[in-house]
């Protein structure tokens, strides 16, 4: 596995060279869906999501998400929790062993922690003169991002339960483009995994990137994660597999 900064450069180079790919990421949150572990947070205040494994509809939605996590394709990359790393909250060996093509695995933290400042500096330049759409919370102020967003596809809180239908809007949007490739940035929790997988299956001509909370400070006018404040994982370098 390349270092975190080299992995970031790998994906940035692909964007610069107009080589489409899909990058979806999952970690301890989606791990709860896989293992039916409840998650109870204040979604209204923090733009996060909850999970009640006693709710039958939520179980159905969780299956859609978790089924998508095993998808593999040549141009599709999964960001996972490191198999053996002191920085990651949970061991990623279970994630790692799901996939046959280990070459298409990367760090779930690729846009944050040790890479956070580089992403803030470099991604706006990489996206310059590109057609960019953003899929994220309706309260996100995308006009405050340090790059132009052509369109904002809005979802609400607990989007993985309430906004599955946005897939059709995204299909129509991507279908209206041929070249050059469009860049879709996703920041909608577990729903991102499902949307990116389904869209890539049908159209491999665009960039589908799970950007997560990397630019939350811009769109919400406040930090939502520890690394935004120089705390938590800020500056910490994932090791992938200790000793290798």
Give short role names for the model-derived ranges.
Residues 1-147:
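Electropositive, gly/pro-rich neighborhoods at or near active sites that engage anionic ligands
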Residues 6-10, 60-67, 165-175, 191-193:
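A short, acidic, amphipathic alpha-helical segment used as a generic capping/interface helix at domain edges
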Residues 80, 134, 151-154, 210:
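Structural signal for conserved beta-strand scaffold positions within catalytic alpha/beta enzyme cores
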Residues 85, 157-159, 215:
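Residue-level detector of flexible, active-site-proximal loop/helix-junction positions
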Residues 131, 182-183:
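Structural motif
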Residues 140, 146-182:
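A mid-sequence, solvent-exposed acidic-amphipathic segment
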Residues 186-189:
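Glycine-rich beta-strand-to-loop/alpha-helix junction loops that act as flexible
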Residues 191-244:
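C-terminal functional extensions of proteins
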């Amino acid at each position: 596995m390349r270092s975190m900064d080299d992995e970031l450069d790998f994906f940035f180079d692909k964007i610069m060279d107009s080589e489409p790919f899909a990058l979806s990421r999952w970690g301890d949150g989606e791990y709860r869906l896989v293992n039916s572990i409840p998650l109870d947070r204040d979604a209204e205040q923090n733009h996060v999501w909850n999970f009640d494994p006693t709710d039958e509809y939520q179980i159905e939605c969780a299956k859609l998400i978790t089924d998508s996590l095993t998808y593999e394709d040549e141009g599709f990359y999964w960001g996972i929790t490191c198999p053996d790393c002191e920085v990651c909250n949970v061991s990623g060996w279970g994630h790692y062993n799901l996939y046959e093509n280990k070459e298409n695995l990367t760090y779930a933290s690729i846009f944050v922690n040790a890479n956070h400042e580089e992403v803030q500096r470099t991604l706006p330049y990489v996206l310059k003169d590109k057609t960019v759409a953003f899929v994220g919370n309706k309260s996100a102020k995308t006009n405050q991002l340090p790059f132009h967003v052509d369109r904002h596809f809005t979802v609400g809180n607990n989007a993985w339960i309430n906004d599955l239908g946005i897939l059709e809007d995204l299909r129509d949007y991507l279908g209206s483009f041929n070249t050059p490739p469009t860049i879709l940035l996703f920041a909608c929790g577990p729903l991102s995994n499902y949307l990116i997988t389904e869209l890539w299956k049908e159209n491999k001509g665009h960039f589908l990137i799970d950007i997560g909370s990397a630019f939350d400070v811009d769109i919400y006018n406040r930090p939502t994660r520890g690394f935004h404040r120089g705390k938590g994982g800020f500056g910490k370098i994932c090791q992938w597999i200790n000793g290798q």
